[in-house]
UniProtKB/Swiss-Prot annotation:
Family indicated by similarity: Belongs to the GRAS family.
Residue interval(s) of motif VHIID: 383-387
Function of the protein: Probable transcription factor involved in plant development.
Signal peptide residues on this chain, from the entry's feature table: none
Any one Gene Ontology molecular-function term assigned to this protein's record: DNA-binding transcription factor activity
Protein name: Scarecrow-like protein 27
Length: 640
């Protein structure tokens, strides 16, 4: 969705002066060591020149690592999705008459207005790109539990943001062994005791976010026997991925010729699998394997990009996977600095994705409904969200609107204020940090508009790697309800047990999880690559079915970066871990059933989508959104 950069020029993204935007010396927005050229690159947010942000690139540690710093703001958030054509007979379909009855009985006639794809027209604020009700960040009909309206509540301003650090830790070489013993209630390990800084203090630009040593030194992963079976839906049959008993076997696999790769999906799958297996040996400094993998991917990618003018979703997904694997070979772990214009394009792609696919709406509204139902009890003055994947913060706009609607007296028992604590990994570039601060300012602005008292605190997820520095004082009072948003792909699998143990001590009212079909930390890296191929093929199919003109920008600025991020994170923690649901159970959490209201809300949401092919399935205590019987995302709730 090409946007004119000039339309956003003027006073800046939020119409704030540079002095007010960066007045707080505690924030990471002044870097005296950067060159003037880099200042000019990031200085213009959208209009006037702003000081260069101090970032993780500054190797400075906080003089007071455990000092807390708070700030009042608002929230937005993110995800993926698609559009479709057929419906299964065994599940709830988008076009089911029963759904029409449910929606009518619940008084959901205004949902069309909420979910319309109306554009803000000539609005001159990037905030409107994200917060526009037409892009799934608006307000649900009150009957849905997401009412509109605002009360006479002001948004207090108190700054608090704790920045990130680079904190070494002791890795787990085999997390599965620790969980097999039933006496182990939760996998736990002790990292070094050097105190981590809370703030986004930093290291060097090229330092990995999580520096990991080889989890299996001296062992060549290419020689492992992988005998996993995976269904590949294109052929509607079980396929066994190649298993290599030696590096020679992998090296002997022929690279697909231009005449066969485009016609036989199994060949493409085989080559991607073999390349991924070879890439797993790069930690052992095996140059031969690197060269072999690079050759396979280069030739495969060249063919995929030149095979036809109109590529199928499978071909496009395979091409993105190949590009991501090549980036791993070249150690391109840090994305280049983004320009303000690219940032606008990424936000525009995010908005287009939310309008094109019901994915974001399904995740956000289902999670928020569960949070409201668990936290909306008499006596709670405030809801405290602990978020491990804030994105652009769009998830919380409807929640703030609902809280604002209760202030006027419609729902007097409802909490009237909101606090957000964001746990984020150390930004690997100035761009990551820039986006985080951009989101923070968006949230502050929106909280002021709906007049909801709202605080935000930014903490390093690395604080949770050492129990000695756990911020257990996050709960401010007994009248504060705590809800956790923990997408499965938001943290490295090796860190999940410690994070769950920390959350267990906080005793949250609810933990909400979203799980995409490609988040497979329990599979070896090559198999995880194929899972990602299958998942993103299905996602692109759903987007193609919508016939949206913005599909290319969505794919370039949203889907492709998602693939790169997924594979990079999975490759950094190459060792397999137990399925995440087992980890939750081992750490003392039990699944909580989602309500009938949440299920009916999801069904009506998909029913009103113009593309047929999406449907909702209820699997045990979870709700699953599928595209033509293929899982796109699952939302579940957990309690301790």
């Amino acid at each position: 969705m090409p946007l004119s950069f000039e339309r956003f020029q003027g006073e800046g993204v939020f119409g704030l002066s540079s002095s007010s935007f960066y007045s707080d010396s505690q924030k990471i927005w002044s870097n005296q060591d950067k060159t003037e050229a880099k200042q000019e690159d990031l200085g213009y947010v959208v209009g006037g020149f702003l000081p260069e942000p101090t970032s993780v690139l500054d190797a400075l540690r906080s003089p007071s690592p455990l000092a807390s710093y708070s700030s009042t703001t608002t929230t937005l958030s993110s995800s993926h999705g698609g559009g479709g054509t057929t419906v299964t007979n065994t599940t709830v379909t988008a076009g089911d008459d029963n759904n029409n009855n449910k929606c009518s009985q619940m008084g959901l006639d205004d949902l069309d207005g909420v979910l319309s794809a109306s554009s803000p027209g000539q609005e001159q604020s990037i905030l409107r790109l994200i917060m526009d009700p037409g892009s799934a960040f608006g307000v649900f009909d009150p009957g849905f539990g997401f009412g509109s309206g605002s009360g006479p509540v002001s948004a207090p301003v108190s700054d608090n943001s704790n920045l990130l650090c680079n904190f070494p830790f002791q890795e787990i070489t085999n997390p599965a062994e620790a969980l097999i013993n039933p006496s182990n209630h939760c996998l736990f390990y002790n990292p070094p005791l050097s105190p981590p800084a809370k703030r986004f203090n930093s290291g060097s630009l090229h330092q990995p976010v999580f520096p990991l040593s080889d989890p299996d030194p001296g062992h060549d992963p290419v020689r492992r026997q992988h005998q996993f079976q995976f269904p590949f839906y294109h052929n509607n049959q079980q396929q066994q991925f190649p298993s290599s008993s030696s590096s020679t076997a992998v090296a002997m696999v022929p690279v697909p010729s231009p005449g066969m790769a485009g016609d036989d999906q199994s060949v493409i799958i085989e080559q991607l699998f073999n390349a991924a297996e070879l890439i797993g040996t790069t930690g052992n400094n095996n140059g031969d394997h690197t060269v072999l993998a690079q050759g396979i991917l280069a030739r495969l990618n060249h063919h995929l990009n030149t095979s036809s003018n109109h590529k199928s979703p499978f071909q496009r997904a395979a091409s993105h996977i190949a590009e991501a694997l090549l980036s791993l070979i070249h150690n391109e772990s840090s994305p280049p600095l983004i320009t303000p214009e690219n940032l606008i394009l990424r936000i525009a792609a995010y908005r287009s994705f939310s309008e094109t696919s019901p994915f974001l709406q399904f995740v956000n509204f289902t999670a928020n409904q569960s949070i409201l139902e668990s936290c909306n009890e008499s006596g709670f003055d405030r809801i405290h969200i602990i978020d491990f994947d804030v994105g652009y913060g769009g998830q919380w706009s409807s929640l703030m609107q609902e809280l604002a609607s209760g202030v006027g007296g419609r729902r007097r028992n409802r909490a009237s204020s909101l606090k957000l604590t964001v746990f984020a990994p150390p930004p690997s570039t100035v761009s990551d940090e820039f986006e985080l601060r951009f989101t923070e300012e968006n949230l502050k602005t929106f909280a002021g508009e709906v007049k909801i008292p709202f605080e935000i605190e930014l903490l390093s997820v690395e604080l949770l790697l050492n129990p000695a520095y756990w911020p257990l004082s996050l709960r401010s009072s007994e009248k504060e309800a705590i809800a956790v948003n923990l997408p499965v792909n938001s943290v490295a699998s090796g860190y999940l047990p410690l994070i769950l143990r920390f959350l267990k001590q906080l005793s949250p009212n609810i933990v909400v999880c979203s799980d995409r079909g490609c988040d497979r930390n329990d599979a070896p890296f090559p198999n995880a690559v194929i899972h990602s191929l299958q998942y993103h093929t299905s996602l692109l199919e759903s987007l193609d079915a919508n016939q949206n003109q913005d599909d290319s920008s969505i794919e370039r600025f949203w889907v492709q970066p998602s693939i790169e991020k997924l594979l990079m994170k999975r490759h950094r923690w190459i060792e397999r871990s137990p399925p995440w649901r087992i980890l939750f159970t081992q750490c003392g959490f039990s699944p909580a059933s989602l309500s009938q209201m949440a299920e009916a809300q999801a069904e009506c949401l998909l029913q009103r989508n113009p593309v047929r092919g999406f449907h909702v399935e209820k699997r045990q205590s979870s709700l699953v959104m599928c595209w033509q019987r293929k899982e796109l995302v699952t939302v579940s709730a957990w309690k301790c």
